[in-house]
């Protein structure tokens, strides 16, 4: 079985380690004259390998049931592990000394036995994890997304296997060739940008700006504006976007705390998350493969259609936009499309540019399509700046039907030709940006049938997200209730004994989920159910766990009756 593990490192502890490496290398460079920054990065890479090895060893000790899709917080690890300690954020001076000392000891042991942790005792493991791990997110890979491996006999009979697949009318996504017998943990350490104090305004400005032609074409709508005066501060970074573009989009840097935990909180059937992630990763990998491959090979973009556009559609409130943003967070954490040589640093790994369709439209004729051209021109400059740095740019268009409506329908309704011009401009600009290996476009829609056929045809993958099933509702309730217990809103009496709330009330919550699923309720509405419950039946906090579950059942009954 294969597991993807996203390892969120405690930012304050990581800063102590980075500072220690810098101090050591500055002293060393005075004597040897070596590049202290390069040596410091190398040591940081060794430290992260050590951390991954310790986490892997810990996960291998867990029972199979716990390795299913779940989140393990640093607090849980601290409560469970003998030898763990709780540290402040940021650590005290004494705790910083402990962090430095333990890291040096374990790094020495780790390097002396060629990257193994067998000689490290469990107490050291637990102490190490409590100092450096903030959260571990575990995602079990579905069998349909594990690489296909054929044995010798299957290769000889390959034709027969293919005939049986093509002749079958059923779509079976769990064929027999996929599974391995040994557990595999693919671990991706990361630290959210907000947790790194080293961030300084303008820290990502680099010499790449000098390589870009600063003079923009006059017909691009900038009226003589150049990249020099298009550089603006957004958050902690300077990026080459004009003020006009910044008025039309929202910018998010990745990985960010805003999006952390969203991927795990979402539950969909048919492996939609895994499929969407696979499509996005392969799209970026194919583009990068062409860039880093043999210069004499034929352009792969002429052989494989890769428009860098994924479309997610479904009813309102099903989590389409959240899914897209969470996908980008995971891409920035796992970075499977990059060369994998970078360590945790203060630079962003990706940017989400969320296009506001409502702001794109103007009352002046021709201005709407001009706004789209300006935004895409700025995005192109941003792509050029980050192209060689392994940083991807995602354009997110929410409710894309506003700017990609069917031109046939617009013409038949005698709509203004400005709407048609907007669609034409959007398609042209998407075609223009697909050549960049670090570009990805995500679009969401509530009305797939209203979209222009040419836009839908450009999508490399079209994914339907419907209202949650009973299993999906159960997952949503579980996530919401766990947050309420953690925040102290619900008083769970058995928590001190190690019993999980979900284990105690599993049968009851499942019945509530089945009741809600009979009336086809959106995920957004289900997330409101605990708030409805508290508002209608309680006046003070915390609330008793048994009383909360009873009130939740009553609220579910009311909600179901109102939707019939």
UniProtKB/Swiss-Prot annotation:
Would you name any one GO CC term? nucleolus
Where located?
Nucleus, Nucleolus; Chromosome
Q: Is-annotated flag, keyword Membrane?
A: no
List the SMART domains hit by this protein, alphabetically. Answer: AAA
The coiled-coil regions, if any, are none
Mind listing the UniProt keywords for this protein, alphabetically?
ATP-binding, Chromosome, Meiosis, Nucleotide-binding, Nucleus
Q: What induces it?
A: Induced at the onset of meiosis I and reaches a maximum level during pachytene (at protein level).
Q: Which Pfam families match?
A: AAA
Fetch the InterPro entries from UniProt.
AAA+_ATPase, ATPase_AAA_core, P-loop_NTPase, Pch2-like
What biological-process terms (Gene Ontology) are attached? meiotic DNA double-strand break formation; meiotic recombination checkpoint signaling; reciprocal meiotic recombination
Residues reported to bind ATP: 314-321
Q: What does this protein do?
A: Required for the pachytene checkpoint, the meiotic checkpoint that prevents chromosome segregation when defects in recombination and synaptonemal complex formation occurred. Represses meiotic recombination in the rDNA, probably by excluding the meiosis-specific protein HOP1 from the nucleolar region.
PANTHER family named among the record's database cross-references: PACHYTENE CHECKPOINT PROTEIN 2 (PTHR45991), PACHYTENE CHECKPOINT PROTEIN 2 HOMOLOG (PTHR45991:SF1)
Family indicated by similarity: Belongs to the AAA ATPase family. PCH2 subfamily.
* Protein's name according to its UniProt entry: Pachytene checkpoint protein 2
User: Which source organism?
Assistant: Saccharomyces cerevisiae (strain ATCC 204508 / S288c) (Baker's yeast)
User: Which lineage do the record's taxonomy fields give for this organism?
Assistant: Eukaryota, Fungi, Dikarya, Ascomycota, Saccharomycotina
């Amino acid at each position: 079985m294969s597991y993807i593990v996203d390892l969120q490192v405690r930012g304050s502890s990581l800063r102590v380690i980075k500072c220690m490496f810098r101090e050591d290398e500055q002293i060393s460079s005075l004597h040897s004259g070596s590049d202290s920054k390069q040596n410091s990065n190398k040591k940081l890479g060794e430290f992260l390998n050590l951390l991954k090895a310790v986490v892997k060893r810990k996960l291998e000790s867990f029972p199979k049931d716990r390795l299913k899709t779940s989140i393990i917080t640093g607090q849980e690890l601290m409560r469970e592990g003998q030898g763990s300690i709780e540290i402040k954020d940021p650590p005290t001076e004494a705790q910083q000394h402990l962090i430095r000392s333990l890291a040096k000891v374990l790094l020495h042991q780790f390097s002396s036995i060629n990257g193994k942790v067998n000689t490290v005792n469990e107490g050291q493991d637990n102490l190490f994890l409590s100092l450096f791990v903030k959260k571990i997110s575990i995602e079990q890979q579905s069998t349909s997304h594990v690489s296909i491996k054929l044995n010798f006999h299957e290769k000889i009979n390959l034709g027969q296997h293919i005939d049986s697949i093509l002749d079958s009318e059923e779509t079976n996504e769990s064929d027999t060739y996929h599974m391995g017998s040994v557990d595999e943990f693919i671990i991706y350490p990361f630290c959210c940008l907000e947790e790194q104090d080293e961030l300084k305004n303008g820290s990502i400005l680099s010499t790449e700006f000098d390589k870009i032609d600063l003079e923009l074409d006059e017909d691009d709508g900038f009226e003589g504006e150049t990249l020099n005066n298009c550089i603006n501060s957004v958050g902690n970074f300077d990026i080459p976007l004009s003020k006009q573009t910044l008025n039309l989009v929202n910018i998010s840097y990745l990985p960010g705390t805003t999006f952390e935990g969203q991927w795990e909180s979402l539950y969909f059937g048919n492996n939609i998350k895994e499929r969407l992630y696979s499509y996005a990763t392969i799209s970026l990998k194919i583009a990068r493969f062409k860039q880093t491959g043999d210069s004499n090979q034929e352009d792969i973009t002429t052989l494989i259609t890769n428009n860098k556009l994924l479309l997610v559609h479904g009813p309102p409130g099903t989590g389409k936009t959240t899914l897209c943003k969470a996908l980008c967070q995971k891409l920035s954490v796992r970075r499977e499309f990059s060369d994998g040589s970078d360590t945790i640093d203060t630079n962003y790994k990706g940017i989400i540019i969320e296009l506001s369709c409502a702001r794109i439209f103007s009352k002046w004729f021709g201005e709407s399509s001009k706004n789209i051209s300006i935004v895409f021109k700025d995005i192109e400059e941003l792509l050029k700046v980050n192209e060689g740095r392994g940083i991807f740019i995602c354009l997110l268009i929410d409710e894309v039907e506003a700017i990609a409506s069917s031109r046939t329908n617009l013409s038949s309704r005698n709509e203004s030709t400005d709407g048609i011009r907007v669609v034409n401009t959007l398609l042209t600009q998407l075609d223009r940006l697909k050549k960049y290996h670090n570009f990805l476009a995500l679009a969401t829609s509530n009305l797939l049938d209203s979209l222009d056929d040419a836009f839908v045809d450009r999508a490399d993958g079209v994914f339907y997200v419907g209202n949650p099933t009973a299993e999906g509702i159960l997952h949503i309730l579980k996530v919401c209730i766990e947050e309420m217990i953690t925040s102290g809103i619900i008083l769970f009496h058995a928590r001190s004994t190690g019993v999980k709330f979900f284990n105690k009330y599993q049968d009851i919550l499942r019945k509530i989920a089945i009741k809600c699923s009979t009336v086809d309720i959106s995920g957004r509405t289900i997330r409101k159910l605990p708030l409805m419950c508290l508002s209608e039946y309680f006046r003070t906090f915390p609330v008793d766990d048994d009383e909360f579950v009873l009130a939740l059942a009553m609220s579910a009954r009311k909600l179901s009756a109102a939707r019939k």
